Amino acid sequence: MKRKLLVFATIIVASAGISLGADAAAIWAQNCASCHGKDGSGTTTMGKKLGVKDYSKDQGFSDAEAANVIKNGKGKMKGYKAKLSDADVKALVAYVRSLKK
């Protein structure tokens, strides 16, 4: 019985990890892409107006710094701590890292 429970728990955890990337992409598309662009380049009309960084090239920040900006905002960017869970923020930081070319 314990073995079955362990196998089941492993499957659940693995499944959660698989959906994490899709969730981060959806969070990015819904909350970030209008300024930062789908690819993180910041070449949208709003991104150019605000002078956002090109995250496909410039990633000179730590994961903790990125999480802090996502949660609390910076400059004209609003914070998302009331909207996103810590797991969402962590997934979003990993997603931003994946945008680097």
Question: What residue ranges belong to the model's regions?
Answer:
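Electrostatic cytochrome c docking/interface patches
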Residues: V13-I27, T43, S62-E65
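Post-cleavage N-terminal segment of exported redox proteins
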Residues: M1-A22, V69, S98-K101
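Extracytoplasmic electron-transfer domains, predominantly the class I c-type cytochrome c fold
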Residues: K49-K101
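Amphipathic alpha-helical interaction segments
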Residues: A16, C35-H36, D63, D88
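Short hydrophobic/aromatic-rich motifs at helix boundaries and adjacent loops
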Residues: R3, G37-D39, F61
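Periplasmic/extracellular electron-transfer cofactor-ligation site
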Residues: A25-G51, K74-K76, L99-K101
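A short linear-motif detector with a strong N-terminal bias
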Residues: A14, C32-H36, Y55-K57
